[in-house]
Swiss-Prot record:
InterPro entries on file: Importin-a_IBB, Snurportin-1, Snurportin-1_N, Snurportin1_C
GO cellular component, one term: nucleoplasm
Primary location group: nucleus
GO biological process: cytoskeleton organization; protein import into nucleus; protein tetramerization; RNA import into nucleus; snRNA import into nucleus
Record protein name field: Snurportin-1
Function: Functions as an U snRNP-specific nuclear import adapter. Involved in the trimethylguanosine (m3G)-cap-dependent nuclear import of U snRNPs. Binds specifically to the terminal m3G-cap U snRNAs.
Disordered: annotated segments: 15-34, 69-90, 317-365
Phylogenetic lineage: Eukaryota, Metazoa, Chordata, Craniata, Vertebrata
Organism: Gallus gallus (Chicken)
Length: 365
C-alpha cells in the first residue's frame, strides 16, 4: 500500500501543467510557468511508466469500498486542499480522513494535439455537473467530492448499493461520475471497480466497453425508484476522426453539454491529473484541432470567451499594483480572473449577475 499511495501522490503532482483551472494556453496571452517537457513527451513517459508498474489495486479498491484503513498511516483531515472549490455544506460528522481525496482521474487542457488522435483517442461528451466518486458497498451507496468529503449516502441498484442486492461483502462498485443536481442523475464517466473486480490497470477502451455492457445488465439503474432515488446513466464515447467530431458537435444531447474529454485508448485509470486525458470546450475544437465544423449551438463562442483576455490583463494589473510583481502566479490569476475555473458552474448569460461574477466550469475535469 505504501507504494500505491506514493504513486497516487505522484499522479496528483501532475496537476500544475495545463490545468483547466486556468485559461487554455493557446487561447490566451497569459503565460503560466509553462510545461517544460511538453505535453506529448509527458504522455509518452506515462504510457511507458504504466506498462512497467503494477500496483495493488485489488487491496486499494477493497479499502475504498469497506472503509478499512487498518494498518495504514492515517492522513487525518486537518485542513482543506486550499483551492476553495468545495463550497458545499458538509456535516462535520460526515467528514472522513483524506483517504477518499484525490481518487479521480482528472484532465489537462488539450494543448499539444496528438499525432495519433484519430487512431488512439476517444472522446466523451460531458454534461454540466459536479464530479463525484461513487462507492456502492455493504448495502449503501456513498458519493464523495474530489476532496474526499461524503456529501450523500443513499440506496441504489448498483451492485452492493442496497440491502437487497448485497449477498456478500465482496460485491461493491467504485465509479467516476458527474452529478447533475437538476436532473437528479449520476452520469457514469468511468469505472474503477465493478462487483469487486478492479479495472484500474485496464485500458480505457476496455473499461468503457465493459462498463457499457455491465450497465445494460442492471435493470432499473437508469430510472428513479424507492431503492434507486438517483438515476445512473452511462455516457457514450465516440471516435476522434474528423467526421465523428463534426457529427458529435451537431448532435442534440439529452443534457446540457459542458465539454469534451479526450482519452488515450491505452490509459489506465490513474488518480490525479494526467496529460493522457484532455479537456476542451466545444467551441474550442475548431481553433485547437484545426477542424472546420458546422455552426451549431455547441460551437458558438460564449460571451465570456471574448472577455477572458481582458480579465487576465486586469488581474495582472491589479497584482502589479498590490504586490509590485511583474506577473501573478497561475493560482492567483485563477482566483482573481473569474474565467473558466475548474470547479464552478458553466457561466450564466452575460446579463446574469452570477454569470458576471463566475465564468467557469462546474465539472472537475
Amino acid at each position: 500500500m505504501e507504494e500505491l499511495c506514493a504513486a497516487l501522490a505522484g499522479g496528483v503532482a501532475l496537476a500544475a501543467p495545463n490545468s483547466p483551472a486556468a485559461p487554455h494556453p493557446r487561447l490566451s496571452a497569459y503565460k503560466g510557468r509553462g510545461d517544460r517537457l511538453g505535453q506529448a513527451e509527458r504522455r509518452r513517459r506515462l504510457l511507458c511508466l504504466q506498462r512497467e508498474r503494477r500496483l495493488d489495486y485489488v487491496n486499494h479498491a477493497r479499502r475504498l469500498a469497506e472503509g478499512d484503513w487498518a494498518g495504514v498511516e492515517s492522513d487525518e483531515d486537518g485542513g482543506e486542499d486550499g483551492d476553495g472549490e468545495e463550497e458545499m455544506e458538509v456535516d462535520a460528522g460526515r467528514r472522513l480522513p483524506k483517504r477518499y481525496a484525490n481518487q479521480l482521474m482528472l484532465s489537462e487542457w488539450l494543448v499539444d494535439v496528438p499525432v495519433d488522435l484519430e487512431q488512439e483517442w476517444i472522446v466523451v461528451v460531458c454534461p454540466v455537473g459536479k464530479r463525484a466518486l461513487v462507492v456502492a458497498s455493504r448495502g449503501s451507496t456513498a458519493a464523495y467530492t474530489k476532496s474526499g468529503f461524503c456529501v450523500n449516502r443513499f440506496p441504489s441498484l448498483l451492485p452492493g448499493g442496497n440491502r437487497h442486492n448485497t449477498m456478500n461483502e465482496k460485491v461493491y462498485c467504485i465509479l467516476d461520475c458527474i452529478y447533475n443536481e437538476a436532473e437528479q442523475t449520476y452520469y457514469i464517466l468511468d469505472v474503477m471497480c465493478w462487483r469487486g473486480h478492479p479495472v484500474y490497470d485496464c485500458q480505457t477502451d476496455f473499461r468503457f466497453f465493459w462498463l457499457s455492457s455491465k450497465i445494460q445488465e442492471e435493470e432499473g439503474l437508469g430510472e428513479k425508484s424507492r431503492i434507486n432515488p438517483y438515476k445512473f446513466v452511462g455516457l457514450q464515447n465516440f471516435p476522434c476522426t474528423s467526421e465523428s467530431l463534426c457529427e458529435v458537435l451537431t448532435t442534440n444531447f439529452p443534457f446540457e453539454v459542458d465539454g469534451l474529454l479526450f482519452y488515450h485508448k491505452q490509459t489506465h485509470y490513474t488518480p490525479g491529473s494526467t496529460p493522457l486525458v484532455g479537456w476542451l470546450r466545444p467551441y474550442m475544437v475548431p481553433d485547437i484541432l484545426g477542424l472546420t465544423v458546422p455552426a451549431t449551438p455547441l460551437t458558438a463562442k460564449p460571451d465570456y470567451a471574448g472577455r477572458q483576455l481582458q480579465q487576465i490583463i486586469e488581474s495582472k494589473r491589479s497584482k502589479k499594483l498590490a504586490a509590485g510583481k511583474a506577473q501573478p502566479s497561475a493560482e492567483a490569476a485563477a482566483r482573481n480572473g473569474h474565467y473558466e475555473l475548474e470547479h464552478l458552474s458553466t457561466p450564466q448569460p452575460a446579463n446574469s449577475a452570477q454569470g458576471q461574477e463566475e465564468a467557469g466550469s462546474q465539472m472537475e475535469n
